[in-house]
């Protein structure tokens, strides 16, 4: 029996590739992103894949491997500036109708927005209190892949033309990244990102204060935010995930990659 902490690193150092951490995925005037680069979106209704492979029975002693991976993943996202990126997403640019001072989107969504004059009453939208909640980790049925759930939360403060009317909204949503291991022709293993998706239905927007006279505006704003936020957040998070994988501790990355390549279960269900 081999202890996870005592593996000799035979595969050498993982390449320390530099991840381009972009604040916003696309400039105004382009359609909202559904994926970044190699981060592909799942179709609506598509579930995480089942590979139909019988799990490998192993005594690989990896009691703390899942916890260490989650902790390192969380630290990487935070040190990579995920909260700052969320806080500086200029949502107003994507919500105000085309032709307003703040600009707007083109395409189908832009036409929908421009047909809602109530949105002209919005003066400013600020993201406050961004949070990275507890990261979830699930292994595929064949134990060769990981699905990392990145739960995010933040509040929105919306200033309107109506004097004394400040809307406060709470937003929560998940981004799920698929992680698997590959081995090159020299036998060196590394972790790579597969699909990086916004699971449909994970977005939750709730009103923190009650403003009856503005209910129509609230309904219109919530509808637009539901369409806009997932693509923007996904465009921020997915490149960061790729950067986190490339900068993981070498020993931890090797142990996780080795376990996945062997098809060893190490994620402890709680």
Swiss-Prot record:
Cellular-component GO terms for this entry: extracellular region
Localization, UniProt: Secreted
Signal peptide: 1-19
GO molecular function: lipid binding
Main location: secreted
Gene3D superfamilies assigned: Bactericidal permeability-increasing protein, domain 1
Cystine pairs: 196-238
Coiled coil: none
Highest taxon of source: Eukaryota
Xref: PANTHER family: BPI FOLD-CONTAINING FAMILY A MEMBER 1, BPI FOLD-CONTAINING FAMILY A MEMBER 5
Described purpose of this protein according to its UniProt entry: May play a role in innate immunity in the oral cavity.
Name of the protein this chain belongs to: BPI fold-containing family A member 5
Gene name as annotated: Bpifa5
């Amino acid at each position: 029996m081999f202890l996870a902490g005592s593996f000799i690193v035979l595969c050498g150092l993982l390449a320390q590739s530099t991840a381009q951490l972009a604040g916003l995925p696309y400039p105004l005037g382009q359609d909202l992103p559904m994926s970044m680069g190699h981060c592909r979106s799942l179709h609506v209704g598509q579930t995480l894949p089942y590979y139909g492979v019988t799990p490998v029975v192993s005594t690989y002693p990896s009691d703390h491997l899942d916890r260490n991976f989650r902790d390192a993943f969380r630290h990487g996202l935070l040190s990579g500036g995920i909260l700052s990126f969320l806080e500086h997403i200029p949502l107003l640019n994507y919500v105000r109708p085309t032709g307003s001072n703040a600009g707007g989107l083109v395409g189908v969504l832009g036409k929908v927005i421009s047909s809602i004059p109530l949105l002209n009453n919005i003066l400013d939208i600020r993201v406050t209190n961004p949070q990275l909640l507890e990261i979830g980790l699930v292994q595929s049925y064949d134990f060769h892949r990981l699905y990392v759930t990145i739960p995010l939360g933040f509040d929105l403060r919306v200033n309107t033309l109506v004097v004394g009317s400040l809307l406060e909204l709470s937003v929560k949503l998940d981004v799920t990244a698929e992680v698997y291991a590959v081995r090159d022709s020299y036998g060196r293993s590394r972790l790579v990102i597969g699909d990086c998706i916004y699971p449909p239905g994970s977005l939750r927007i709730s009103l923190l204060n009650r403003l009856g006279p503005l209910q129509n505006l609230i309904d219109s704003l919530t509808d637009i935010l539901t369409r806009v936020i997932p693509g923007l957040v996904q465009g921020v998070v997915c490149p960061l995930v790729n950067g986190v994988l490339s900068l993981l501790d070498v020993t931890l990355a090797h142990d996780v990659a080795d376990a996945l390549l062997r098809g060893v279960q190490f994620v402890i269900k709680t």
